[in-house]
Amino acid sequence: MVGSHKASGVLLVLLVVMATTIANGTPVVDKAKNAATAVEDTAKNAATAVGGAAASVGAKVSGAKPGAAVDVKASGAKGDSKTDDSAAFAAAWKEACAAGSTITVPKGEYMVESLEFKGPCKGPVTLELNGNFKAPATVKTTKPHAGWIDFENIADFTLNGNKAIFDGQGSLAWKANDCAKTGKCNSLPINIRFTGLTNSKINSITSTNSKLFHMNILNCKNITLSDIGIDAPPESLNTDGIHIGRSNGVNLIGAKIKTGDDCVSIGDGTENLIVENVECGPGHGISIGSLGRYPNEQPVKGVTVRKCLIKNTDNGVRIKTWPGSPPGIASNILFEDITMDNVSLPVLIDQEYCPYGHCKAGVPSQVKLSDVTIKGIKGTSATKVAVKLMCSKGVPCTNIALSDINLVHNGKEGPAVSACSNIKPILSGKLVPAACTEVAKPGP
């Protein structure tokens, strides 16, 4: 079509030139050549423009637009609670990670053997969930600290759960758990692992019946978890709700946790952590530690736990370190505005923590605790000892402040008491029970 327009144009120009030449006496051949060249260049430019437009349209038709959402069902997922959808999720992640886009998960129950969502990715990635996940019920040992579902080395990641449930089906695993005999508790999968995430958000997900820990946050920086649910019965052994370690700038804002171990456990290398508006119970409370079990542990610094409700748990807020430990540090810690409801040992520092007898009993812990503030703690204690501060003989606690504590016990043993060892706390405000009226001893 361009060719026919080109020929018509050339003929028209030649006629005009010839007429002008006859009138002005200018050589016809030179004028005609110049006119023909101009028309040909115009035609080439037009053809190039048309061809470029066609190529662009072809690219859009033949390939997915960068950043477009990837539907996991388009990648082959069934969501029928029976088919293993692991391969479909892997394919969807590969596509979304390469483009920096969103994965959408429609309603359904997705059975997955295991999943690995690994970066780095080309750009920010969002996982938008409207379905639930279910693990196999069978018990399989894994490499230490492995996860059922892993998110690893991703920046600017968002997980919008929309109340999605990750069901680890752990009841058979709890029966097979032999931690009490061996002290080895890491051969079962963690429900969800977040490793090496930066500038990321985890919103509105629930982990149920994990075979081991529910969530593990390791080597992360600047991530926020909100509207988190953890649900497992009290008999689920070693099912810490959310464990945080070797991470900086983690914010846990809003969680309801019921489990068989610590609701929140804070491991070595944790810095600048905020835990806020957490409801905990049943479980073992909110704990820093245990620390000092392994060599080369990193300091814990800048931990704030505030505005929490702890109910029907074995402990409230506590710091626990192993006797006979290598040197370590935990400092700049704040427990504030926390309500206890029928909690055993609501406030506890235990530097002789020795579960299952796997420790060097009688050898002082070398983890130094300092600059700890325990403020605004109120409610009821299920045990007569409501505050127990048992620090290390080797490196006694320093700058431990107690302020505005009101914990009551209505049992047959009498009113609540406070027991201390190797510590001279800084006291302020009203303290019930009165501080350090008894000597702290190992044991519950």
From Swiss-Prot:
One of its GO terms (molecular function) is galacturan 1,4-alpha-galacturonidase activity. Its EC number is 3.2.1.67. Keywords: Cell wall, Cell wall biogenesis/degradation, Disulfide bond, Glycoprotein, Glycosidase, Hydrolase, Repeat, Secreted, Signal. It catalyses: [(1->4)-alpha-D-galacturonosyl](n) + H2O = alpha-D-galacturonate + [(1->4)-alpha-D-galacturonosyl](n-1). Gene3D superfamilies: Single-stranded right-handed beta-helix, Pectin lyase-like (2.160.20.10). Disulfide bonds join C263-C280, C391-C397, C420-C436. Residues 1-23 form the signal peptide. It comes from the Eukaryota. The active site is at D261 (proton donor), H284. GO terms for cellular component: extracellular region. InterPro entries: Glyco_hydro_28 (IPR000743), PbH1 (IPR006626), Pectin_lyas_fold (IPR012334), Pectin_lyase_fold/virulence (IPR011050). It is found in: Secreted; Secreted, Cell wall. Glycans are attached at N222, N342. GO terms for biological process: carbohydrate metabolic process; cell wall organization. It holds the Pfam family Glyco_hydro_28. PbH1 repeats lie at residues 220-246, 247-268, 270-290, 300-321, 330-351. PROSITE patterns: POLYGALACTURONASE (PS00502). Belongs to the glycosyl hydrolase 28 family. May function in depolymerizing pectin during pollen development, germination, and tube growth. Acts as an exo-polygalacturonase. This is Exopolygalacturonase clone GBGA483. It comes from Arabidopsis thaliana (Mouse-ear cress).
